[in-house]
Amino acid sequence: MLALLLTLAVPAEDLPARLRHLESAAAAWSPAPSPDGTRVAFLTTMFGGRQAASIALEGGYPTQLTDEPGGIAEIRYVPSEPRQLLVVALRDDRRRLLLMDEDGAPPAPLDAAAGDQFPGGFTRDGKKLFYVVRDGSKVSLRSIAMDTRKVSEVVPPPPAAGAQRAVGSLSLEDAFSGLFALGPLSPDGRSIVALVVRSGSEAVVLADLQAARAELLTPDKAARFRQPRFSPDGRTLYVLTDAGRSALGVDAITVQDRTRRTVYAPGNPLDAFAVSDDGHRLAVAVDSTGLDVFSLLDLPSLRVQPLAAPPAGALAGGIIWDRPGERLLFGWRLADDTTDIWQLRLGRGSPTRLTRSPRPALSRNAIPRPTLVRAGEAQAWLWRPPDLPKPRVAVLISETPTRPVFDKRIAALNFAGLAVLAVNGPGAQRAALAFLKAAEDLDPRDPLLLNPDGLPVEDPSKWSGVVNGPRKGQGGHELDPDDPDLRALVRYARRGGAL
């Protein structure tokens, strides 16, 4: 009774304070285990901005590794040095490769060449790194010796060497012109994979490092290709793709003859997969009504093994095995809590949380959870502010399906008294407007459109305002999804009203 009276006596916190708490909430994602299996590096906003940190795999307090004003885009350990890391930092809006260690030494640039730098992969002994430098239309595939820091460009052998060009092969500059991801390196170190965009469609390219020529592995019609992984013997390349089907699944490409076969495509989209270092196990994350479900399969039999499930949520990025193949590491998003690094030890019970990102003065009960609804033929998610009988609505549309997980932008609008309806797919805007018109417990007047991906707005007159992502050039209000100005968002949603 005393606790109840004290609760009732506490005044409701004002909106500016709640938005401040939201802005202070952090996240952690993109785990990368160390070669010796003792630590895991990851990306986080615990220290302000997108920085790199590391933590002992058995638990502890995270150590901040970087302090880059532009933030960090990627991180991985150097295979030959357990405490040395390669990071991709954003400097002057360019991706730059830096080498650093966990002992606090300043990060050192690997290559002074201008342009964006894409890491591809280390040789097995960790003594050489392959990467691409792209500056405008110029693309250069390079390697660097980690001990001497000597940079070498991958170039074709001289004509006198007698090398024969493969029929249909491409120059590296042509093959990498639409590069958006590089790697992995083949186990024998003779070739490297690249993901590119050609003629408006994604494709997988395999580059021969000795001949400095490349070939298309996927000369198909429009499709997505993601997360390429070699088998331990280098004969097979696994890739996440929707080629020839409506949802993403795992295919295997035989490197020698370029044939492709389906390995696992259950019907529901796959968000990520990982092949163990011994090549005998395939871990997959399957989208089930917006939430991810893990499965573990033997290769090549595809016999399903039991796998403990983390709390209901969705992946933040991919999944990765540690080197012994004893545990899976992944970033995990929850509906009412921060995104953090989790580990799943095979045969050791439930997954455990490695990091606990701060959310000061923000209890889990204070974060509204979404409800699954139907907007026409589409599945939709509705976040409602508590204790408001008929709130105004903001409609969220995006290129990819919205997940029912904690989002600062949605929580800020809920705190400000707006409901958020997330609808995806063709006709999403019309379906959302029809849903609002039919809903008796929502105010259909003056809806706000949240359009972070800059999708075409079918009828601007139907919306009281439009919130776009940065540099989308469609007018309205711009909001950075990685570092949103929540107060500006709420002011715009309230049509300029004070907080």
What is each PLM-predicted segment?
Residues 56, 69, 101, 114, ...:
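Residues at the C-termini of beta-strands that transition into short coil/loop
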Residues 11-28:
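A short helix->beta-strand "capping" segment at the edge of beta-propeller domains
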Residues 11-16, 39, 43-64, 78-109, ...:
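Beta-propeller blade-edge and WD-like acidic-aromatic loop motif
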